[in-house]
Amino acid sequence: MFDAKKFLADVSHEPGVYRMYDDKDQVIYVGKAKDLKKRLSSYFRKNLSSKKTEALVASIHHIDTMLTSSETEALLLEHNFIKLYQPRYNVLLRDDKSYPFILLTKERHPRITSYRGSKKFAGEYFGPYPHAGAVRETLSLLQKLFPVRQCENSVYSNRSRPCLQYQIGRCSAPCVQGYVSDEEYNQQVELARLFLQGKDQQVLDYLIGKMEQASRNLDFEQAARYRDQIQAVRSVIEKQFVSNERLDDMDIMSIAYQHGLACVQVMFIRQGKVLGNRSYFPKVPANTDLSELTETFVGQFYLQGHQGRSIPNSIIVDRQLAEKSELEQLLTEQAGRKVTIQESVKGDKSKYLQLAQVNAKAALNVQLKQSSRMSERYQALCDLLNLPEIKRMECFDISHTMGNQTVASCVVFNQEGPLKSDYRRFNIEGITGGDDYAAMEQALQKRYERDLEEDKIPDIIFIDGGKGQLNRALNVFQHLQVKWDKNRPHLIGVAKGVDRRAGQEVLIISKQDREIHLPDDSLALHLIQHIRDESHNHAISGHRKKRQKAFTQSGLETIEGVGAKRRQALLKYLGGLQGVKKATLDEIASVPGISLKLAETIFETLKND
């Protein structure tokens, strides 16, 4: 029993962070306070504010505290601890990915490309966009409007004639001399920049002026090209929502909550344009107040993400926040400029907020229906296997091409569906090419030879294959020397049936020593097919990446003494890989950073390749 009175006697009145632990020494809640003693004392009053707090207090075994120099510092530390410990009584944002940007590079002939990560390359960044699909859509649109290159520099610097993009009018071919002047190309780059900044009218005014000038000069062919470009830009603008207000960069957030599930809808607006929206489904403890949920989400969303998750000038929410000023101060410090959180808005901002609310409710309804279907399928599988409960399932598959670049995948499902953060791939090495049995054995060893936490032990492991694959898996588990309960998982083989068609799968249950043929309409079969297909796709995508990497390797990677900088120098000065292969020993030695001895090694290696 936790002695609250004894603990509180030594707690300071300073600002800080506290961590609450259960009897298994697991952090179950992280909080922060302007006055630690006052805040922690509130947990041990007779009349607690909610059932959630009652359940939390009943689980406390011990508490530790950490003093901070300010409440703002405590707020930042709180979010860092939440990310680290993932406590079950905190609201948890289950998305920590960076967001993609569009990058306009700073070069003689700039290119437009998608980019994700820290902003380390010279150029202008536009975004963030809610997902990669929104970036691809925008890049495709830009290609149709402005013939600016999107190719990699390795392609651009080694062209002797224009590529297909020039032939279909989506690039002006700056890579080949004589097709477009630097001035003409940079004009199109500037138009693309203005368009990405939301300055559509400036783009139209410029193009109209150029069209009229071409007409006056009797250059009707050029005037027609400008006319077509004007029509294309106008067509795009007409499809966009046009605000009468001058809108700042902002994110708009709305929350919908029903049956224990919450959806946070975020709309991204930059330079007055809606870049897109995205739905988030944070893990919410029972009886959590929606204002607390909003507050926690805002903090985690901007303070726990990667550098790609930029902070806008203003954040609009549909709930009153108790710690609004503290959040604003912290976000301002993080962004290096003033950031405001608005709880009451008018005009177009209000329309956007209403739109976010509608989308949040719609996304929540879809998620509730999917969760209901997933729950039904889980129950059907439990009934089929005579199991009281299934919390976690894992499935393995193998992918290769003629025995080369073999990759194994492991996908994970919990009661809510795919748990993509726990997906893994394994590079399979040291086996006979095409030996799927050995590949599966190696994948299982890599996955399960290490220590597993209690909640990471799967209840079911699906093996994509028949009895042979399943027997190899059983052999691996028989010889495992681990601390966790290796007998807990049920190993199940999923054979494809006689005709290898969907719906004819045969389940081979190792512990029950039986085979099950399921009807096409079986909910349990649908769940198994979902898991198996997910594993198959994950394995194939990993194999393709590995195969593409092997295909694009220059051969220089394997030469000792040739790192990334020297490789780039060789390719740059000798005109690509073919230029390096055709170069003489003296030509290789003339490249900056390449000694005569290293040049001899490179020359001999490529000659014998």
From Swiss-Prot:
One of its GO terms (cellular component) is excinuclease repair complex. PROSITE patterns: GIY_YIG (PS50164), UVR (PS50151), UVRC (PS50165). GO terms for molecular function: DNA binding; excinuclease ABC activity. Keywords: Cytoplasm, DNA damage, DNA excision, DNA repair, Excision nuclease, SOS response. It is found in: Cytoplasm. The keyword ATP-binding does not apply. GO terms for biological process: nucleotide-excision repair; SOS response. Residues 13-91 form the GIY-YIG domain. Gene3D superfamilies: 5' to 3' exonuclease, C-terminal subdomain, GIY-YIG endonuclease, UVR domain, UvrC, RNAse H endonuclease domain. Residues 201-236 form the UVR domain. SMART domains: GIYc, HhH1. The keyword DNA damage applies. It comes from the Bacteria. Interacts with UvrB in an incision complex. Belongs to the UvrC family. The UvrABC repair system catalyzes the recognition and processing of DNA lesions. UvrC both incises the 5' and 3' sides of the lesion. The N-terminal half is responsible for the 3' incision and the C-terminal half is responsible for the 5' incision. PANTHER family: UVRABC SYSTEM PROTEIN C, UVRC/OXIDOREDUCTASE. NCBIfam families: PRK00558.1-5 (NF001824), uvrC (TIGR00194). This is UvrABC system protein C. The gene is uvrC.
